[in-house]
Amino acid sequence: MKLQLWTIGKTNDAYLKEGCAQYTKRLPHYLPFEYLEIPEPKNTKLSSDVLKKEEEKLIFDRLQDSDQLILLDEKGNEFTSTEFGQYIQKKMNSVAGNLIFLIGGPYGFSDAVYKRANGKIALSKMTFSHQMVRLFALEQLYRACTIIKGEKYHH
């Protein structure tokens, strides 16, 4: 089982790239981890629905049947950091394939991606850019791992 964070498109801002790189380096200390930036569709003049369908193809091309797909979605379940750690621990103990957290593009996900998903989580009731959410998600994944291991990172 590998824990993965997938995103649509590259991280643009240097400060976000640096923060993401820090947590991407730290996470493999706890478990097999992969951070994957799926290239966004080339034609940016597409309607939001067509763009979501194009992103869907890119996601499904990489997804295996045994993978657990968890969407980061504003309508998802909210957790405290401790609850999120317990959620990950439970998934790691029960998932045969990879545990994949997916951050969509600026317009969210297609209906087919929602149907394929095994769950949805929200990081907050607030709205964040899909660029910033990457760093927040990586930090929370790292925090969850330290909670699972009983380390002092989380107070």
UniProtKB/Swiss-Prot annotation:
Keywords: Cytoplasm, Methyltransferase, rRNA processing, S-adenosyl-L-methionine, Transferase. Its EC number is 2.1.1.177. Pfam families: SPOUT_MTase. Gene3D superfamilies: 3.40.1280.10. GO terms for cellular component: cytoplasm. GO terms for molecular function: rRNA (pseudouridine-N3-)-methyltransferase activity. The keyword Transmembrane does not apply. InterPro entries: Alpha/beta_knot_MTases (IPR029028), RlmH-like (IPR003742), tRNA_m1G_MTases_N (IPR029026). Homodimer. Belongs to the RNA methyltransferase RlmH family. Specifically methylates the pseudouridine at position 1915 (m3Psi1915) in 23S rRNA. This is Ribosomal RNA large subunit methyltransferase H. It comes from Cytophaga hutchinsonii (strain ATCC 33406 / DSM 1761 / CIP 103989 / NBRC 15051 / NCIMB 9469 / D465). The lineage of its organism: Bacteria, Pseudomonadati, Bacteroidota, Cytophagia, Cytophagales. The gene is rlmH.
